[in-house]
């Protein structure tokens, strides 16, 4: 008996592309609906992305959490990203979850982002950061220039469609990635300092 073909899923959340953005954060694919604590990127309450942002910009890991709820405040997050000029865009538009979970290891990519079309909407964007290895691999494939895979925390030149961009590979904020919250926040802080979006700590 043949097994049923695995479902091709479409990314449920659109990119957030502030026209004045100077930085774009790019990940892969969100968890299934039952693991989402809000309707926006990095929605799993066990994922530390928005705790990292809270620490970096407000010195408060709970800044983007809903009071007394195990959920993040999507509208507060979006307003902050728009105000600071930070875009959030997936590298993957369609994919198959080979094991039915959010693991990049078992994510079969069907369709990737049209990076040129995305960047065309943000003429001032100069810095791209990825939130894990898979997103980094996808962007290097799209760029097609033989750039060596950067190590976690490393920044490399990323020339694309006539623009001199940088690409920084940041650690995954998934709890499955073996790095504590403070060290993840330090890596993201270093990136945002480099991009001029937060002041260096003395």
Language-model features and meaning:
Residues 22-23, 127:
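Structural motif
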Residues 16, 78-81, 121:
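Short, conserved, surface-exposed binding loops centered on an aromatic residue
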Residues 25-28:
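N-terminal nucleotide-binding beta1-loop-alpha1 segment
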Residues 83-142:
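Internal catalytic-core helix/loop-beta-alpha segment
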Residues 57, 142-143:
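Active-site catalytic pocket residues across diverse enzymes, especially alpha/beta-hydrolases
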Residues 52-56, 135-138, 190, 194:
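Amphipathic alpha-helical segments that form well-ordered structural scaffolds
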Residues 34, 38-107:
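Short, surface-exposed acidic-centric catalytic microdomains
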Residues 1-15, 19, 31-36, 43-45, ...:
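C-terminal capping/extension of enzyme domains
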